[in-house]
Every structure is written in structure tokens, then in C-alpha cells.
Amino acid sequence: MTFSVQHAEIHFNRNHIPVSDQFNDVYFSNENGLAETDYVFLQGNQLWERWISHNEANFVIAETGFGTGLNFFAVTQLFREFRQQHENHPLKRLNFISFEKYPLKITALSQAHLAYPQFEDLSAHLQRYWPSLILGCHRIHFGETTLDLWLGNVSENLPQLGDYMNERIDAWFLDGFAPSKNPEMWNDDLYKLMFRFTKPNGSFATFTAASAVRKGLESAGFNVTKRKGFGKKRECLSGLKIQSKSTVLSTPWYLAQPAKMEKQDVAIIGGGIASFCAAISLVKRGAKVTIYCEDDALALNASGNKQGAFYPQLSDDNALTVDFYLHAFSYGRQLLDWAIEQNIEFEHEFCGVALCAYNEKSAVKLTKISQLGLPNEIFQMLSAEQLSEKVGLPLNCEGGWIEQGAWLAPRQFVQNAFSFLEKQGVIIKTSQKITALSQQEKGWELENTQGQKYCHEVVILANGYKITDFVQTEKLPLYPIRGQVSQIPTSENLLKLKSVLCYDGYLTPANQLKTSHCIGASHVRDNVDRHFSEQEQQENQQKLQQNIAQPWTQDVNTSDNLARVGIRCSVRDLAPMVGNVPHFEQQQADYYNLFNLRRRKQPIQSAANFQNIFLIAALGSRGLTSAPLLGETLASIIYGEPLPISEGILHNLSANRAWVKKWLKGSKVE
């Protein structure tokens, strides 16, 4: 398993232009890099003229070679000007997908940005959220423009856009170092993928006029035109996709399918963190959102704890799940920062998270995680002495340290964040238990326990373990897990705890009033009893005292019997679910013979799903970390926009994955 990439090695020439040591080429023109960007890419793709005639809500640009971000800054600024001049135009959002094999170090990035002070606000935001060296897609929001920065080799990352992105890209910035300097990137496989992902009448533009590039693009299917080059360059290329070619889907059983909407009217069933994260991503896209929560207040189930840990679920046995959580952790931090900037009040502390090697099994697991090559700010292995210093209390074991980890107050966060959304027009209906969904001509009818009915175009199920209460979802292999979290008084010793401490359970630092801590949680599968358990209360205390055999743990006292019980939703492989709700009976009919269909290379239909019903499910005990990226992914699917995750991760999160794995083996699904 490889999750990390390498930094670029560069120097600055006498014109203060960054130069790649790997490729011995400049990042942008010595003459006027911004003018070259404008001429080659913005004018070469006729962006302004095409935006004027564009009749969809979003426009997608893809780029090879992010470099310093100059092209991105220029097109973002141009799009801002377009939106200011055309406020009522159908085009509302710009998606910019860029691939970078060797990202700059933050110091080099900030130095390069000094050359373009007119982009100061954009460069400051990019520098703030400049990603760790984690392979794959990193989504960063810049108002109405969204950047998907894919780190790693474009030959590996571009295919990960997957079947979903077929014919969804409007324009290409074919950039990067010159073909003579970087021949590995400029190849026929790249051009074929570009053509596959480009919309009919979509375009490309590039600074080069190299014969091999022109022939490769023409062979892929583009109509290529030579135009005058920038500055001293004689010629450059641009082109269009005039005719489409049929493309065989590689994994039709996992194909994500957008919603069909006219009014952008979305109902979300559920009142916790998953519901909020879906809602905020939808609201940013202009959706009219209504929340249906069966409790008399929001965040009363699994999202209702006073303190919860925020850190990625790392393991040594499922690369795709680890990959998801690494990106979810980064994206989730952006959402928390956004909430703080919006003055949404919630207790929190970015204090780090310690993972204790409390027994032989956990020590082996953490050692294997340390061999994944993750950046130190994500994970590093520390000695018992080093970890004790981070934690603030003595430990008898080594362990992992997650520098960017945190704790926050989930119930306070969710309730206040929903109050913020209510002011943005989100309708919140509490004490509304939805019991049935019925498909109508233009959407779905929701019926509650009193027989009242509500109609919406799109429905999202985000109601935790009760997601299988509906006919449409009853076959999903989900199950409930009861978890009791204990609240304990602090002490002189416990006040020294500086970080979240994880073992076969967890202990948080003191809350902001410095009066109490949370310790938990029990884990009882297939149990939905919400009553207090004295046995589980004692077990929460005993697990800490047994795993961390230090005198200070005797201060932990659960005898006040202060606790709350939440019911989490989980699945056997421990990965969340997001996307379309699959139609089990129809997929069973289409795919029961999938093993033989593939072997014989026979045509295979795209997955049959319930139109306009989606879900976020199986968040388990990591909902604080996973929900923000899941919500953003789901909103992207619903609106048919580029996804912030790879095709591989999407497959690993698909609701029908357990069924498909059996069908692919020729096994029957009951």
C-alpha cells in the first residue's frame, strides 16, 4: 500500500521564476506567465464566449500539471468576473480538476506566489489548505469555484475519474513541462482518456505544437487546430471533440447516477451529523432542503455525545478504506474551519490524538500503519516517553500520534450548525418519523406516523441504523451497535490530559469548563436498547485501567452513573456507504449471473437504482471524520459534478458492494 507522494525539487532563477530540478524546465514563462496563461488556455478554450452560451449550472475544466496554481488563479478570477457581470446566468459553479505529480513545498509555493500579488486572496487560501503529501484527490473550495487537486502520477490518477466522468469535462488545459522534458506524461493513453472524459464539443488547449502531441490528439479523436504561439513560440495547439466514440463501462454495477431535478427540492431524513453534512453541501449548490427528524430535537442519537474524537480510521488491511479516511480527515478539517469562521459555536480543541499500543495485537497493527509512509502530521510512531509528553500523563506503552486530531462537541456542533442553515432557508421538521416512501411522477411521497404526506423531488436517507426501515432499503446488510459513553468528573491528575487518548476505548481531555471528561464507548452489536447499563459503565472504566496500567487512571470514576447511549449504524467491512439506493430485486435479476457475463465478455447493464433516492449510512464510530466528505460526495453525485474521491474509493463505499462481490464470484445473495 502506497499513500504518499514526493515534493518537487526546485530552485528560482534570476527572474524569480521557479524551475524544476527533476525536469529542468520553468513552471511558467520567463516573459509573462500570466499573459501566456490567458492567451494559451483561457482564450485557447474560448472560455468567456462559451460561458455566455452555457446552459448548465456547472462548467468543468481539467488540467495536467498544477504547478504553482497560476492557471487556476487566472481562470478563477475570470469566472468571478463572469459571475459578477451575469448574476442571473444559469452557469453558477466552476469545477477545476488538476493533476500534479510533484507538489511544491509550501515555502516554495508561497515564494512563487509573490510574483502575482493580484491573486493574494486566492493564494493565501490555497496555502492555508495546501494538502499533505497524500496520493489522490484533495478538494478545496474557493467560493463558486471548486479545486480538485489530484496528487500523484497523472497516468495513475486520471483513470480514477472512472466511468462516472465519461463525457463530463468541458475544457482541458494540457499543461505541464515540455514534451521533450517530460515525455512520460505526453502519451497516447493520456490523449485517449482526455477524449473519453470530454463532453461533445468540449475543447482542449496547449502551449506546445509538437508533432507527436498533435498526432496523438488527432488519433484519439480530437479535431486539432494550430494557432499562433505565445511570445517567441511559433505555434500552439487547440482542438475540439466533434464526434463521440462508444465507451464500454468497466464497472457498470457501481456507476453513480445523478438525480433528475427541476426545482432542486431535496428531503433529508435524519437529524445528525450525516444529515447536516449532506445539507450544507446541497445548500451551497442552491438546493431547497427540508430535514425530517423523528426526535423532538436534532442530534439526539449517535451524534448526541458531549465530546467526540476527530481523527482518521487507520488500519493495515484495507487500503481503500484507509485512503478514504485520509482524505475525509483533511476535508473534515476544512468544514470545521468553515464553521468556526461562520461563528457557529461548538466546544472543540485541536489537541492531537494518541493511539496506544496497549497490547501485542495493537502494537503490531500500529507498527504496520507506521510502515505505510504517511506524512508525520498525519501519523507518526512515538516511544512511550514521547507519547507521554504529548498526552501530558505517563503511559506504559509506545503508540501512534495524530498531530492534527481533535475533539469536539458533536451535539452542540450539529444543533448550532443546523440553526445556521435554518437562517439560510433550510426547513427543519422535528417529531416527524417518516415510515414510508412512495414513488410519484416527479419525485417521492413521504408519509409519517400520523398519515401526513409530503412530496419532494429527491430523498436522502441519513437516519442511522433505522435506514433499513423502508421497503427500498430493507435488504442492505446494515446492523445497529449500541454504544454507551460515560461522563466522569475531572481531577487534578486528569486535568493534565492534553490530547485524546485511544486504547480499547477512548478518554477525552476535560471539556472547556474544565469539569468533566468523556470515556467510552461500549460496543454491543444488534442491540438498540437506549437505557443506561451499569455493567457497561463499569466496563468503560475498567478498560482504561487495564489497558493503561498507570496510577493516574485510578482517578477515573464512573460511579456517578452519568452517561448517554447512542445507537450507531455499521456494516461488516466497516466502510461507510454513500450514493444511490440500489434496487435489490432488479440488480439480483440483472447480476445473478455476473460471473459468467464477465467471463464471456457479454454486455452488462448499468446498476438498477431507485431514481432520486440516495443515502449516507454505516458511519459507525467515525462519523465526525467521515460525514463531511460523504456529504460532499453525495451532493456531487446528485448534481452530476466531479467527485472528490477516486473511482476505487467510490466502489468501496457503494451500497451494493457486498452483493456485487458475491455476484462476481458466482455466489447467490439471499
Curated annotation (Swiss-Prot):
NCBIfam families: MnmC_Cterm, PRK01747.1-2, PRK01747.1-5, tRNA_MNMC2. Residues 269-670 are annotated as: FAD-dependent cmnm(5)s(2)U34 oxidoreductase. Its EC number is 2.1.1.61, 1.5.-.-. One of its GO terms (biological process) is methylation. It is found in: Cytoplasm. Residues 1-242 are annotated as: tRNA (mnm(5)s(2)U34)-methyltransferase. This is tRNA 5-methylaminomethyl-2-thiouridine biosynthesis bifunctional protein MnmC. Catalyzes the last two steps in the biosynthesis of 5-methylaminomethyl-2-thiouridine (mnm(5)s(2)U) at the wobble position (U34) in tRNA. Catalyzes the FAD-dependent demodification of cmnm(5)s(2)U34 to nm(5)s(2)U34, followed by the transfer of a methyl group from S-adenosyl-L-methionine to nm(5)s(2)U34, to form mnm(5)s(2)U34. The keyword tRNA processing applies. GO terms for cellular component: cytoplasm. In the N-terminal section; belongs to the methyltransferase superfamily. tRNA (mnm(5)s(2)U34)-methyltransferase family. It comes from Haemophilus influenzae (strain 86-028NP). It catalyses: 5-aminomethyl-2-thiouridine(34) in tRNA + S-adenosyl-L-methionine = 5-methylaminomethyl-2-thiouridine(34) in tRNA + S-adenosyl-L-homocysteine + H(+). Keywords: Cytoplasm, FAD, Flavoprotein, Methyltransferase, Multifunctional enzyme, Oxidoreductase, S-adenosyl-L-methionine, Transferase, tRNA processing. Its cofactor is FAD.
